[in-house]
């Protein structure tokens, strides 16, 4: 059964009958509705799990992934204890910036998804900025 965004928010606020995964999907769609990746400025999409963090740069006009990086990469695993730390996220952001600059991508749009701009997400963004990406 599909609900409109207004109905979902009303359910969340009044009855508390909305399941967390549906609320997360609604939140992701509300953020993504404002952000579109183009050829000039592709979208940097972030996914965070309990153990690792994944990021990819996507061109939404052709729906193709241009660059991908995660904390499971060998370089990042060797330099950090595990993928749950902000240091690992910062290293991953720098590596992602290096890979994207090799493909002549310097300007991007940051899509944090349903996550708050805090902790590992912020560390990834700071690492990408330090690596040379502009957003």
From Swiss-Prot:
It comes from the Eukaryota. It comes from Thalassiosira pseudonana. It is found in: Plastid, Chloroplast. Belongs to the universal ribosomal protein uL18 family. InterPro entries: Ribosomal_uL18_bac-type (IPR004389), Ribosomal_uL18_bac/euk (IPR005484). This is Large ribosomal subunit protein uL18c. HAMAP family: Ribosomal_uL18_B. One of its GO terms (biological process) is translation.
């Amino acid at each position: 059964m599909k609900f409109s965004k207004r109905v979902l928010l009303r359910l969340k606020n009044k009855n508390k009958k909305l399941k967390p995964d549906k609320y997360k999907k609604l939140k992701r769609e509300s953020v993504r509705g404002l952000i579109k990746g183009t050829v000039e400025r592709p979208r940097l999409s972030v996914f965070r799990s309990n153990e690792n963090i994944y990021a990819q740069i996507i061109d939404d006009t052709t729906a193709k992934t241009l660059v991908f990086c995660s904390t499971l990469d060998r370089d990042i695993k060797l330099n950090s204890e595990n993928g749950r730390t902000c240091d690992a996220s910062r290293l991953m952001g720098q590596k992602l910036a290096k890979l994207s600059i090799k493909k002549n991508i310097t300007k991007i749009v940051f899509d944090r998804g349903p996550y708050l701009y805090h902790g590992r997400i912020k560390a990834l963004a700071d690492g990408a900025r330090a690596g040379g990406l502009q957003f």
